[in-house]
Amino acid sequence: MNFKYIVAVSFLIASAYARSVQNDEQSLSQRDVLEEESLREIRGIGGKILSGLKTALKGAAKELASTYLHRKRTAEEHEVMKRLEAVMRDLDSLDYPEEASERETRGFNQDEIANLFTKKEKRILGPVLGLVGEPLGGLIKKIG
């Protein structure tokens, strides 16, 4: 008779343990889903901010280009215009990365592609901020 009780208690303990393991797995998978959703939201917000920044930089670059376009330029201003045109092309290539870098990305894996675009964005944003900052500062001084 004691053997039956031992078997029954062992069975109850094993089933309770199995249920707790199953509940732990479910809560972990729910946490993973929530973390993934949070990451998607963060990426979406980051993408919107980056898109807005790109649009603002394009607008500023176009405004600077039109400012420099209607007057005689010095050699230095001519170089600035060339850089602005190159930056505009790079910004456009960020808007359409599939078409612009199709040749560059053949044979790369996804991590290398992501790193390539991150480096490209950093390479573009640094000079753009410098190029846009100098003329805007000059325009503000003239206006003010």
From Swiss-Prot:
Main subcellular localisation: secreted
Expression sites (tissue/organ): Expressed by the skin glands.
Keyword presence, Signal: yes
Annotated signal sequence range: 1-18
Compartment(s): Secreted
Proregion positions: 19-43, 73-122
Keywords tagged on the record: Amidation, Amphibian defense peptide, Antibiotic, Antimicrobial, Cleavage on pair of basic residues, Cytolysis, Fungicide, Hemolysis, Secreted, Signal
GO annotations of cellular component type: extracellular region
UniProt cross-references to Pfam families, sorted A to Z: Bombinin (PF05298)
InterPro entries: Bombinin (IPR007962)
One BP annotation, GO: killing of cells of another organism
Keyword ATP-binding carried by entry: no
Isoleucine amide modification, residue list: I143
Family: Belongs to the bombinin family.
Protein task: Maximin-3 shows antibacterial activity against both Gram-positive and Gram-negative bacteria. It also shows antimicrobial activity against the fungus C.albicans, but not against A.flavus nor P.uticale. It has little hemolytic activity. It possess a significant cytotoxicity against tumor cell lines. It possess a significant anti-HIV activity. It shows high spermicidal activity. Maximin-H14 shows antimicrobial activity against bacteria and against the fungus C.albicans. Shows strong hemolytic activity.
Protein name, UniProt field: Maximins 3/H14
